[in-house]
UniProtKB/Swiss-Prot annotation:
One Pfam family of this chain: LysR_substrate
UniProt organism field: Salmonella typhimurium (strain LT2 / SGSC1412 / ATCC 700720)
Annotated keywords: DNA-binding, Transcription, Transcription regulation
Designated gene of the protein: argP
Record-level Gene Ontology MF annotations: DNA binding; DNA-binding transcription factor activity
PROSITE patterns referenced in this protein's UniProt entry, alphabetically: HTH_LYSR
Subunit structure: Homodimer.
Domain of life per record: Bacteria
Protein name: HTH-type transcriptional regulator ArgP
Keyword Cell wall biogenesis/degradation: no
Signal peptide limits: none
DNA-binding region location: 21-40
GO process annotations (BP): regulation of DNA-templated transcription
Cysteines engaged in disulfide bonds, as pairs: none
Function: Controls the transcription of genes involved in arginine and lysine metabolism.
Length: 297
């Protein structure tokens, strides 16, 4: 069995994290040539490329597996050193999370862990359909995802579901939907998506109104909080988690345009196995809080 030298593997990690050889060399305080040599040593050891030399570079499938291994080793090592050394640097936890979870339940869930444990969070925001890929690539040690199946050498637990409602302000509804929400009226009503790969709005309209993807005008805004603001100010209609707009719905500032219809996204918590003690704390906190505030049926 080939056992990688972790100092050499850190060179591969640095190239991916810093998006190039030059910045990786600066990060590691070595020459660019030395970075290339270390990666070449790894590739010779495993007999295959570990890095696709694009701009920015990206790991091959084998490179992803090695980076995932490095994440696990670093987490266990840092936790052990934390037990042995006083005043050590807080443990870094890189997690991939979707923007809507971050805007609603995730931070309250992590509050007890952050208050009691010496950790530093690196929250990488990604669509819930793609967060698991960051775990697969070894960029993070945990991910909130809609994928229910665990990756090899990983664990998964169900968190619960976010229910999305199709909402807008009352003036917006009066302007664009005077006779109710119909297929023809939707074609004229501005909507919003998180990015070009966000299919939440399009999937809802296709499922319930038989509108093909791309048929509705859509703003692109990379912020869950901005969705709420855009809807409140009467700029767009959009899909927003019910958990995020309970007060606005109760006050009438926002209205549910399609009562009885919703889009449900079941969320799962993925992480490497075996779990360190710190990751077990994170897992327990997420599951306990998620089971309280997210739909479980």
């Amino acid at each position: 069995m080939k056992r990688p030298d972790y100092r050499t593997l850190q060179a591969l990690d640095a190239v991916i994290r810093e998006r190039g050889f030059e910045r990786a060399a600066q990060k590691l305080c070595i020459t660019q040539s030395a970075v290339s040599q270390r990666i070449k040593q790894l590739e010779n050891m495993f007999g295959q490329p570990l890095l696709v030399r694009t701009v920015p570079p990206r790991p091959t499938e084998q490179g992803q597996k090695l980076l995932a291994l490095l994440r696990q080793v670093e987490l266990l090592e840092e936790e052990w050193l934390g037990d042995e050394q006083t005043g050590s640097t807080p443990l870094l936890l890189s997690l991939a999370v979707n923007a809507d979870s971050l805007a609603t339940w995730l931070l309250p869930a992590l509050a007890p862990v952050l208050a009691d444990s010496p950790i530093r969070l690196n929250l990488q925001v990604e669509d819930e359909t793609r967060t698991q890929e960051r775990l697969r690539r070894g960029e993070v040690v945990g991910a909130v995802s809609i994928q229910h199946q665990a990756l090899p050498s990983c664990l998964v637990d169900k968190l619960g579901a976010l229910d999305y409602l199709f909402v807008a302000s009352k003036p917006f509804a009066e302007r664009y939907f005077p006779n109710g929400v119909t297929r023809s009226s939707l074609l004229k009503a501005p909507a919003v998506a998180f990015d070009h790969l966000d299919d939440m709005h399009q999937a809802f309209l296709q499922q319930n109104f038989d509108l093909p993807p791309g048929s509705v005008p859509c703003h692109i805004v990379n912020s869950s909080e901005a969705f709420v603001q855009l809807a409140r100010q009467g700029t767009t209609c959009c899909m927003i988690p019910h958990l995020q707009i309970e007060k606005e719905l109760e006050s009438g500032e926002l209205i549910n345009l399609t009562p009885g219809l919703l889009q449900r996204r079941m969320l799962y918590w993925h992480r490497f196995a075996p779990e360190s003690r710190m990751m077990r704390k994170v897992t327990d906190a997420l599951l306990e809080y998620g089971h309280k505030v997210l739909r479980q049926d």
